């Protein structure tokens, strides 16, 4: 097994153990650690959100004061304290839904 494959397996296992939907959740956690792009109370839109790992992380970081919206063309299971919309992000109609959610 290549080293890169072993590392992916490590994060896949860790994601499963910690309840994240994908190992990509750790990418957002690392980016946020370095650049602080999301904080408590942040409003976040995740375009192309399937399977939802980044939505999970964004919701945990933004907390109850923030709002997180995930949009994807495919079905994504609900995530507590976040909203998921199954919609085409290239459709003009999605803009109204985003504005409506964030008010």
Each language-model region and where it sits:
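Conserved SAM-binding loop of SAM-dependent methyltransferases across substrates and taxa
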Residues: 51-64
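Conserved class I S-adenosyl-L-methionine
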Residues: 40-50
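A generic local structural motif
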Residues: 29-33, 55, 71, 95-96
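Class I SAM-dependent methyltransferase Rossmann-like catalytic core
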Residues: 1-40
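Residue-level signature of catalytic and energy-coupling elements of molecular machines
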Residues: 28, 48, 84
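Short beta-strand element of Class I
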Residues: 65-69
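S-adenosyl-L-methionine
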Residues: 71-103
């Amino acid at each position: 097994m290549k080293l890169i494959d072993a590392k992916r397996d490590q994060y896949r296992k860790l994601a499963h153990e910690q309840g994240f939907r994908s190992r990509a959740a750790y990418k957002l956690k690392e980016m946020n650690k370095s650049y602080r792009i999301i904080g408590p109370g942040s409003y976040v839109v995740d375009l192309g959100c399937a399977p939802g790992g980044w939505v999970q992380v964004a919701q945990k970081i933004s907390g109850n004061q923030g709002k997180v919206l995930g949009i994807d063309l495919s079905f994504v299971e609900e995530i507590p304290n976040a909203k998921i919309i199954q919609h085409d992000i290239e459709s003009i109609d999605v803009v109204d839904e985003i504005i409506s959610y964030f008010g």
